Amino acid sequence: MLTINSDAKLKDLLEFPCSFTYKVMGHAKPELPELVLEVIQRHAPGDYSPKVKPSAKGNYHSVSINITATSIEQVETLYKELGEIDIVRMVL
């Protein structure tokens, strides 16, 4: 997860607003994409079409979603809240 102290380089690389992709990996549950979209809509409302890919064994799914980020604070908040979803194991 990004923190206030570790995001200096990320801040330097990004010019807001910008396109930003989140990849959320979690248990292969049908509600995973809906839970991810719910968090995204709270902080970056829009019309999204997440891409869902199953793992090789089918135990996990990855949900990729692209947003228009408006600030580093928004990026950090989304990383934090997406990671707090119960069935999520990792956010990239």
Curated annotation (Swiss-Prot):
Disulfide pattern: none
GO cellular component: cytosol
Residues passing through the membrane, by range: none
NCBIfam families to which the protein is assigned, alphabetical: PRK04998.1
Family: Belongs to the UPF0250 family.
HAMAP family xref list: UPF0250
Protein's name according to its UniProt entry: UPF0250 protein VP0718
Lineage of origin: Bacteria, Pseudomonadati, Pseudomonadota, Gammaproteobacteria, Vibrionales
